[in-house]
């Protein structure tokens, strides 16, 4: 084969070539190639034919059985997919082929690294989620939810109706109702080291509840406006709270004394998270930033400014030292050690995102103001499922919002609180397989990107 009869001038064409190979691998289990990929394959048919010919002629090629070629781009994709052998063989042949036909000015190391990086981003398959149970009982929007962190037997919700309710996770039955706030309960957090529940409200108060007695034992005063978010430090007897007054307060949970106030945000704070090591506090705000805080020094370690609108939601990964953040049409993940951008998610046209949750199986959930539930592969940023929440009878169109969420401790159940006053529990479809439920098509050229 003459290496001079087909020269490619730019890396865009290199990317397209590698994308076609990846598509072969990604959809190898499907009987038919998706239509939108069929047209793309047509555009690269000649190049793929040359690649196939090169593989057969290569002395290092030792594939077993029938050697299927790409002399045409078939509708029956299961046949063409047989040409996709092991990842190791593709690494070898694709790299050699590129070195043979592409301009020498395109650095070999750059091309190979780019291909290996693309391969590493291939999303893991996850079973789809489906509605398992609907729970009713609140008289207002369900604004917050937290799971029993010790035994995984119950969960608690807070609402616009000023109450909190404790529910049995297995049966969905109401265990008890906690009343004490006089305005909307915006967030709740349950300690895994003490029998304590912390709640914050638009009434400017922070309350500590003894769950063994189901009564308030402490009030924390100091915020000048409504309090939106609370988080318990995983190793210290501290809680962090924040809200409309744009400051974060760290409290000694035993003495009700504010230990430190963190100042820096230029707008109301939507969410705060605590981690065991620096940055020990992560916050997001309507000022379109995410801030990482040095608690000992009492100052910002880093400001993440990639978002363009109010950052309404964040979620810590249960295993990795990373965090996901979301604003309208934009979800990103960050390494917390340095505040480095990890992934841009396929989140265009998702609308306003109110809540994020991540489980230990690398499933990221995003709940939207439009009532859409989106599920992503956390590593690659690929959206593999999107479904609309079930509307309750008598609810208004403006009450479709998914406002809060949490996975249980196993990661196998997702609990959402919604504007139609309902609580919904979702489970993965245990009968689903890759073949029966492949999920939304994955396109390597979309915006999802792992850095």
From Swiss-Prot:
Entry keyword set: Cytoplasm, mRNA processing, mRNA splicing, Nucleus, Repeat, Spliceosome, WD repeat
Keyword field contains Transcription: no
Domain of life: Eukaryota
Localization (cell): Cytoplasm; Nucleus
GO biological process: mRNA splicing, via spliceosome
InterPro entries: G-protein_beta_WD-40_rep, Prp46/PLRG1-like, WD40/YVTN_repeat-like_dom_sf, WD40_repeat_CS, WD40_repeat_dom_sf, WD40_rpt
WD repeats: from-to residues: 137-168, 180-210, 222-252, 264-294, 306-335, 348-377, 397-427
CDD domains: WD40
UniProt GO cellular component terms: catalytic step 2 spliceosome; cytoplasm; Prp19 complex; spliceosomal complex
Family: Belongs to the WD repeat PRL1/PRL2 family.
Self-association and partners: Belongs to the CWC complex (or CEF1-associated complex), a spliceosome subcomplex composed of the U2, U5 and U6 snRNAs and at least BUD13, BUD31, BRR2, CDC40, CEF1, CLF1, CUS1, CWC2, CWC15, CWC21, CWC22, CWC23, CWC24, CWC25, CWC27, ECM2, HSH155, IST3, ISY1, LEA1, MSL1, NTC20, PRP8, PRP9, PRP11, PRP19, PRP21, PRP22, PRP45, PRP46, SLU7, SMB1, SMD1, SMD2, SMD3, SMX2, SMX3, SNT309, SNU114, SPP2, SYF1, SYF2, RSE1 and YJU2. Interacts with CEF1, CLF1, NTC20, PRP45 and SYF1.
More about this protein: Present with 1770 molecules/cell in log phase SD medium.
Known function: Involved in pre-mRNA splicing. May also be required for cell cycle progression at G2/M.
Protein name as catalogued: Pre-mRNA-splicing factor PRP46
Originating gene: PRP46
